[in-house]
From Swiss-Prot:
Name listed for the protein in its UniProt record: Dynein axonemal assembly factor 1
Function (record text): Cilium-specific protein required for the stability of the ciliary architecture. Plays a role in cytoplasmic preassembly of dynein arms. Involved in regulation of microtubule-based cilia and actin-based brush border microvilli.
Family: Belongs to the DNAAF1 family.
Composition-biased stretches (Basic and acidic residues): 37-48, 73-85, 367-395, 547-560, 624-643
Length: 643
């Protein structure tokens, strides 16, 4: 009757069927249950209605929605797996080996680092048969398992896990160190199957009674035991520890039993015979001896034992020092013997053997043995030194090659032996010649005396013999100076000087009074003339030629008329007379100052009395003598300052 109304009914049924399929939105079902207005809107909207031709598209949409739902469920499951922890898979282990630069082939690796990875169980290690060290620290492992293939394992680290029991360690016959600290273990068990177990660390667990550690009696090879920070409180645990024959290191810190045992350290040291390290410090032999003395006789015996050991230690130090002293003494003796052999002498130290015999007679047998050991040690030390460092003959040095002079003063350096210049050598030679002549007391006369003088004048020349350029004290009288310094030299030189020397002395006095830089430089300058250089290099022959060239009459006059120095300076005689002797020490006077020509060469001055310059020099000396007479004793004489 009403076909138009029937069509929407069919459409509405189709919509309900679509709404019942999974993956379709719930809003579509809600719209199906809505009023007629809502249904009319759905019929008028071609996008949301499912008409006959569009049934295939509706089914495809349902299928796509189902696939997306299944993918989301799988992803959720994978996330749950990741939350539960990582698995020790073969792929993961291979990747880890590559990351740590280990071998890709599992059997070639001897160490595997699996700590801090969050594993909850041990698995997939069958291929790693060559492991010697396995790190499983800081994981969530709840059980020791799946270690049957690790027969070569030496070290197993399982600290900071969730273990409650020690088990499944039978395949590890070569295990040496086991660390299961920071777990929840309440009893030590299943360790007797490890025949070579040396180190067991069980700190921070839940051990409480003697029965919990009773299994340690069966661990005969256990050497290091760490039971710190447990709940052990019974002193009877010492019986268990005493039964462990190889126990060397024990740590019981953090247990109540420490407070329950009086004299805890002494008692454990005495009862555990092989203990070398207790808790946080070693057990020294001295501590063990004192503890055993305390066990025998109390605190007094311990004090006595401690004093005896201190005395022995002190004696040991003293013996060491004596051995070193013996080494040094024997080294000095060998050096002294070597020096004696070089000099051709073979003396023996007086009384050395007697002293040694007396000492050996007074010593006790024990001290004698100690002394013999020291001597043996010294002997072996020197033999080793001779083997390693053979002694070589010392080459004579430059100072030893130089001739030793009788008159050479001590402390003179080699640089001071040579004179500064040829003039200095000339000036230094005169006093030595005078000294030799005055010591002999006779004047050289003839060839024999000349040869004797040559032999006596072989002395070294020093810069120290030059006069010191210092000011002379003005308050000192000239007479005292003459008597103290120059009078003996004037009498000795008077026999060697001729009549022309007083004029020469006047010139030198004038030159020394007018001391200037030019004069001093001319004195110490080396002339360029080769003939003068040859003469200065051989001063001995020139000086010794002075005596035979003089006339006997001039020698007699010079020796008969010596005048005192004060009388000469005070005289106002005429310049025409013979000039007086100056206060110059003739032995130390240098040759007459040289004149400098236009080319700058130094030429020797002509002899006084042989040229026209004699009158000019005498006229210049006369006013100087007058000034000296007016000044009196307060005048400062530079000549004596140079002496």
């Amino acid at each position: 009757m009403h076909p138009e109304a029937s069509e929407p009914v069919v459409d509405g049924v189709a919509e309900q069927e679509c709404a019942q399929e999974p993956g379709v939105e719930e809003s579509a079902g809600d719209h199906g249950n809505a009023g007629e207005g809502g249904r009319k809107e759905e019929m008028n909207d071609p996008k949301e209605t499912c008409v006959g031709p569009l049934n295939t598209s509706c089914l495809s949409e349902q299928k796509q929605s189902g696939d997306s739902w299944s993918d989301g469920r799988l992803a959720h499951q994978r996330a749950d797996k990741e939350d539960r922890g990582a698995r020790m898979t073969k792929k993961f282990l291979q990747k880890l080996c590559k990351q740590h630069k280990l071998y890709i082939t599992p059997a070639l690796n001897d160490t595997l680092y699996l700590h801090y990875k969050g594993f909850d169980r041990i698995e997939n290690l069958e291929e790693y048969t060559g492991l010697r060290c396995l790190w499983l620290e800081c994981n969530g492992i709840q059980k020791i398992e799946n270690l049957e293939a690790q027969t070569e394992l030496r070290c197993l680290f399982l600290q900071v896990n969730l273990l409650h029991k020690i088990e499944n360690l039978e395949p590890l016959q070569k295990l040496d160190a086991l660390n299961i600290s920071n777990n929840y273990i309440k009893t030590i068990e299943n360790l007797s199957c490890l025949p070579v177990l040396n180190t067991l660390q069980m700190a921070h667990n839940h051990l409480e009674t003697v029965e919990d550690i009773q299994h340690l009696r069966e661990c005969a090879r256990l050497c290091v035991l760490d039971l710190s920070h447990n709940k052990l409180s019974d002193p009877e645990i010492l019986r268990v520890l005493e039964s462990m024959p190889d126990l060397r290191v024990l740590n019981l810190m953090g247990n109540p039993v420490i407070k329950n045992i009086p004299n805890y350290r002494r008692i454990l040291t005495v009862r555990l015979k092989h203990l070398t390290y207790l808790d946080d410090r070693p057990v020294f032999p001295k501590d063990r001896a004192c503890a055993e003395a305390w066990a025998r006789g109390g605190y007094a015996a311990e004090k006595e034992e401690r004093q005896q050991r201190e005395m022995r230690e002190r004696k040991k130090i003293t013996d060491s020092i004596e051995a070193l002293a013996a080494l040094r003494r024997q080294a000095e003796e060998r050096k002294w013997q070597r020096a004696s052999q070089e000099q051709g002498e073979e003396p023996t130290p007086a009384g050395a053997g007697d002293v040694d015999a007396e000492v050996e007679g007074e010593e006790e047998p024990q001290e004698k043995d100690t002394r013999q050991k020291i001597e043996q040690f010294v002997k072996e030390s020197f033999e080793a030194k001779d083997e390693l460092f053979p002694e070589k003959p010392e080459e004579p040095s430059l100072l030893e090659e130089l001739p030793l002079d009788v008159g050479e003063p001590k402390g003179v350096l080699p640089s001071e032996v040579l004179p500064a210049s040829p003039r200095a050598a000339w000036a230094e030679l005169a006093p030595q010649t005078v000294a030799t002549e005055s010591a002999s007391g006779t004047e050289p006369d003839g060839a024999e005396n000349l040869e004797a003088t040559r032999l006596e004048t072989k002395e070294q020349l020093f810069i120290d013999d030059l006069p010191n350029l210092e000011d002379v004290n003005a308050g000192e009288s000239l007479g005292d100076r003459d008597r103290e310094q120059c009078f003996p030299k004037i009498t000795a030189i008077s026999s060697l000087s001729d009549a022309s020397e007083p004029d020469m002395d006047d010139i030198s006095l004038l030159a020394l009074e007018n001391t200037s830089s030019d004069t001093l430089s001319s004195i110490f300058a080396v002339p360029k003339d080769t003939s003068w250089r040859v003469e200065t290099e051989t001063p001995f022959t020139d000086i010794l030629k002075v005596a035979p060239e003089r006339d006997p009459e001039t020698q007699r006059k010079a020796s008969e008329v010596p005048r005192p120095l004060i009388q000469e300076l005070g005289d106002d005689e005429e310049p025409s007379g013979p000039p007086p002797l100056p206060p110059v020490c003739e032995g130390e006077a240098v040759p007459a100052p040289c004149t400098e020509d236009s080319d700058g060469d130094l030429l020797p001055a002509p002899a006084p009395g042989n040229g026209p310059e004699k009158d000019e020099v005498q006229s210049e000396v006369e006013p100087e003598e007058r000034l000296g007479s007016e000044a009196g004793e307060n005048r400062e004489d530079i000549e004596f300052g140079l002496d």
